[in-house]
Amino acid sequence: MSTYTRPVMLLLCGLLLLTLAIAVLNTLVPLWLAQANLPTWQVGMVSSSYFTGNLVGTLFTGYLIKRIGFNRSYYLASLIFAAGCVGLGGMVGFWSWMSWRFIAGIGCAMIWVVVESALMCSGTSHNRGRLLAAYMMAYYMGTFLGQLLVSKVSGELLHVLPWVTGMILAGILPLLFTRIVNQQTQARHSSSISAMLKLRQARLGVNGCIISGIVLGSLYGLMPLYLKHQGMANASIGFWMAVLVSAGILGQWPMGRLADKFGRLLVLRVQVFVVILGSIAMLTQAAMAPALFILGAAGFTLYPVAMAWACEKVEHHQLVAMNQALLLSYTVGSLLGPSFAAMLMQNYSDNLLFIMIASVSFIYLLMLLRNAGQTPNPVAHI
């Protein structure tokens, strides 16, 4: 059976279009607010409302999938996201935009839960790594193309919203031509997110998603600031961020393939060790290109491998709940990491960004090594 079936390919095509829209809005919304002369703290609050929406959307999507299935949940999530986009055109104001970005955050989180859960339910122990690698490649490629679009088209609010909304609605079209079966509805008992978080045998995967959130959130949010403080121009900062993201895209498929072939545990250990090496190399400032490349290749691929580990520790009917727990863990890490790192950078030194990344990665590496004797490579439930 082929890994990349027709439903999988159509799902990833839809995700690519939706991610393009997400990337464009996430870049332009803060700029639109700044042009409207809103104070910085209000811009930050609007951004926080989006991530709060992510948390809320993550919590109830599993129940929605169980009730109405993958396809209808995907349509509903896309429509909620589109509503959050259209609402921005009404009036530029703090309270209104905070509300609309909260709604958009709910829709985006629902999309991620639906897509990730559908891929996990479609896969087996032999191909889940490659499926999640393809998912991350589509996500980062959409992010990259979204940034490219921002630099090429008009950034005016009323010029952007129509075609971004159209792109969101176009993201629904691929799934109109296929049906993703939800086998979870056949199970007698449903699982809760809290039960998945407490599952001892999946704890390494959950912890890996938290660490991944800390690492990626810190790199995405604070690497441009770090480079700015090194005296770089905006063009140079854009180049180095492109190197970082490109490394993450290029590393997805090889890491997924290696995880399927040699086991998640070995690949997780190597990834975390390489993140530590990349962080140390960034501190030396001797060779930024290779340091950023290996940091991106290892750091950006940690999440899908940790996900595959945790999901192979549960029964098939528990996959949606486990995926919710993992996305929630990643979101919490991506919120806490940048906040703590920014505080360290402001009060002490910019180098503490990489010291923090290396430190949390080292703690996770110790967990992976400590559990070597009692945590064998997981066997999937097919």
Curated annotation (Swiss-Prot):
Which GO terms fall under molecular function for this chain's record?
A: transmembrane transporter activity
Q: Which InterPro entries match?
A: MFS, MFS_dom, MFS_trans_sf, MFS_YcaD, MFS_YcaD-like
Q: Where in the cell is it found?
A: Cell inner membrane
Q: Which residues cross the membrane?
A: 8-28, 45-65, 75-95, 102-122, 131-151, 157-177, 204-224, 231-251, 270-290, 291-311, 325-345, 349-369
Main location, first listed in the record = membrane
Q: Give the membrane topology, semicolon-separated if more than one.
A: Multi-pass membrane protein
Q: Cellular component GO terms, alphabetically?
A: plasma membrane
Q: According to its UniProt record, what is one Pfam family this protein matches?
A: MFS_1
- Which cystines does this chain contain? none
Which keywords does this Swiss-Prot/TrEMBL entry list? Cell inner membrane, Cell membrane, Membrane, Transmembrane, Transmembrane helix, Transport
Q: Which Gene3D superfamilies match?
A: MFS general substrate transporter like domains
PANTHER family of this UniProt entry? TRANSPORTER MFS SUPERFAMILY
For this chain, the family text in UniProt reads: Belongs to the major facilitator superfamily. YcaD (TC 2.A.1.26) family.
Annotated protein name in UniProt: Uncharacterized MFS-type transporter YcaD
